[in-house]
Swiss-Prot record:
UniProt record similarity statement: Belongs to the terpene synthase family. Tpsb subfamily.
Short sequence motif DDXXD motif: positions: 321-325
Residues that coordinate or bind Mg(2+) 2: 321, 325
The protein's name: Santalene synthase
Bound cofactor: record note: Binds 3 Mg(2+) or Mn(2+) ions per subunit.
Role of this protein: Catalyzes a mixture of sesquiterpenoids from (2E,6E)-farnesyl diphosphate in fragrance biosynthesis. Catalyzes the formation of alpha-santalene, beta-santalene, epi-beta-santalene and exo-alpha-bergamotene, as well as traces of alpha-farnesene and beta-farnesene.
Length: 569
């Protein structure tokens, strides 16, 4: 055991609020930059109350859910055409019920994967596309060549397909599962996008028009499954071929899972207000946003440890990020970073009180999470956390040096550092620690494997697209857009389009990583995909994480706070 590990295992827990009085903090009156973040719109008294006053699921609803679950299992076991089975799987997944039917879904998809005897999907655009998407999502490889039958001799998609809106929509969604170099899928995406955009306002079926509009705003593969489930439950209710058993179970299940999440939110809110970090004026106070992100990554009730530790580490991480970005001087940040590298509180007395509070909160919470993992999972994760925190803070330190030195790095250098500074290697490692098979498996995340590299790079670039206007106004660190502008002389508009193109290309690489990263299994592969989907949710239209009163508020409220009305039973 090295010295840092020994320190972590034996260090006493320090209550930072006993040692730091923010009201009399001597560095509070100094001329320091501020994040200018607005106060949280979420009432912390209300959030804390959710620990005991969350939505209680009645016993009769629990019994009804079990009854309906049995009926759905019967559906999976009943004889049906392959396309009908695919559509059943698709609806179950989109309704958010896949965690209840993991075995049935895998068996259904694997049987369809093996059954190529008569090519039942051949020439059927919707069937071919749905089969392609669902099997690739499940980790079963289907070649892009299955779409050649819809192309002419010059490689263009047949114009007759333009009248098949349902098929075009399925083709559009399937195209986002493509890999780098799969030109047929690139053509499919361009073709389907073009003709869906021109057709959706004239679609007679309201449910189909709603689905098309929703997909064009953001493809299914890029959406957060839990948020999508809330939207799809309402959309599915309006469809002519809606299955009432599936709909009723989806509503019950959504509320049951939400009740579990609410209790966790309440307990986490109680912890957060004891840290003192919620009182720091320069930093973001975003506990509920952090929970929403953990829920995006791992909403299944069985991932409680992953969710809670991601929120705890993530909430502290956000404050550390803001300290490096806008608060600390370069000398202070160098001392902070060296203390993290030593994983020691010995030198932090030289820091101003606010940075002492932040360091001790980080130190305490990380050791506390490590002890919880030791208790619940049976292995020592603290060395893994220390490596991740050192990597994290050194990336922040480098960005601070660029800022204080007025240096604009090349885009490639910025991106390699930025994929760490975005925080997702640390957060995904936190999630991995909560589900790893054993202690030896923790070695897989250092050095950073491709799966984490590309998911984190995507989150960095998506974040940059959404936050650059606000952060430029605050005088924050550079973003990829500015690095590209500086290196090429391009306008901001051109730079934005370039970064959007890079995002699309890196999604293709990540899609392939999900097949190539054999050292990782589910659910960690999905954790990585979902982290990027969370980035799309928070940053697709601006800074929905830092600005709490934004478009994200409605979705967060519907997913975390408001249950679905059940109506008459």
């Amino acid at each position: 055991m090295d010295s840092s590990t020994a320190t972590a295992m034996t260090a006493p827990f320090i209550d930072p609020t006993d040692h730091v009085n923010l009201k009399t903090d001597t560095d509070a009156s100094e001329n320091r930059r501020m994040g200018n973040y607005k106060p949280s719109i979420w009432n912390y008294d209300f959030l804390q109350s959710l620990a005991t006053h969350h939505n209680i699921v009645e016993e009769r609803h629990l019994k009804l859910a079990e009854k309906l679950k049995g009926q759905v299992k019967f559906m999976f076991g009943a004889p049906m055409e392959p396309l009908a089975k695919l559509e059943l799987v698709d609806v179950v997944q989109r309704l958010g019920l896949n965690h209840r039917f993991e075995t049935e879904i895998k068996e259904a998809l694997f049987s369809i994967y093996k059954d190529e005897s008569n090519g039942w999907w051949f020439g059927h655009l919707h069937a071919t596309s749905l089969r392609f998407r669902l099997l690739r999502q499940c980790g079963l490889f289907i070649p892009q060549d299955v779409f050649k039958t819809f192309q002419n001799k010059t490689g263009e998609f047949d114009m007759k397909l333009c009248d098949n809106v349902k098929g075009l929509l399925s083709l559009y969604e399937a195209s986002y599962l493509g890999w780098k170099g799969e030109n047929i899928l690139d053509e499919a995406k361009a073709f389907a996008t073009k003709y869906l955009k021109s057709a959706w306002e004239n679609i007679s079926e309201k449910w189909l028009a709603k689905r098309v509009k929703h997909a064009l705003a953001l493809p299914l593969h890029w959406r957060v499954p839990r948020i999508e489930a809330r939207w799809f439950i309402e959309a599915y209710e309006q469809e002519a071929n809606m299955n009432p058993t599936l709909l009723k179970l989806a509503k019950l299940d959504f509320n049951m899972v939400q009740s579990i999440h609410q209790k966790e939110i309440g307990e986490l809110a109680r912890w957060w207000v004891t840290t003192g970090l919620d009182k720091l004026a320069f930093a973001r106070n975003n506990l509920l946003q952090s929970y929403m992100w953990s829920c995006a990554i791992a909403s299944d009730p069985k991932f409680k440890l992953a969710r809670e530790t991601i929120v705890e580490i993530g909430s502290v991480l956000t404050v550390v990020d803001d300290a490096y970005d806008v608060y600390g001087s370069m000398d202070e940040l160098d001392l902070y970073t060296s203390s993290v590298e030593r994983w020691s509180c010995v030198e932090i007395d030289k820091l101003p009180n606010t940075l002492k509070l932040i360091f001790m909160s980080m130190f305490n919470k990380t050791n506390e999470v490590g002890l919880r993992v030791q208790h619940e999972r049976g292995y020592n994760s603290i060395p893994t956390f220390i490596k991740a925190w050192v990597q994290q803070c050194k990336s922040y330190q480098k960005e601070a040096r660029w800022f204080h030195g007025g240096h604009t790095p090349p885009l490639e250098e910025y991106s390699l550092n930025g994929l760490v500074s975005i925080g997702f290697p640390l957060l995904l490692i936190t999630g991995y620690v909560a589900i790893a098979e054993n202690e030896a498996a923790l070695d897989k995340v250092h050095p950073l494997p491709d799966l984490l590299h590309y998911s984190s790079l995507l989150s960095r670039l998506i974040n940059d697209i959404g936050t650059s206007p606000d952060e430029m106004a605050r005088g924050d660190n550079l973003k990829s857009i500015h690095c590209y502008m500086n290196g090429t002389g391009a306008s901001e508009e051109v730079a934005r389009e370039h970064i959007k193109g890079v995002i699309e290309e890196n999604w293709k690489i990540l899609n392939q990583c999900c097949f190539d990263q054999s050292q990782f299994q589910e659910p960690f592969i999905t954790f990585n995909l979902n982290s990027v989907r969370g980035s799309h949710f928070f940053y697709e239209f601006g800074d929905g994480f830092g600005v709490t009163d934004s478009w994200t508020k409605v979705d967060m409220k519907s997913v975390l706070i408001d249950p679905i009305p059940l109506g008459e039973e």
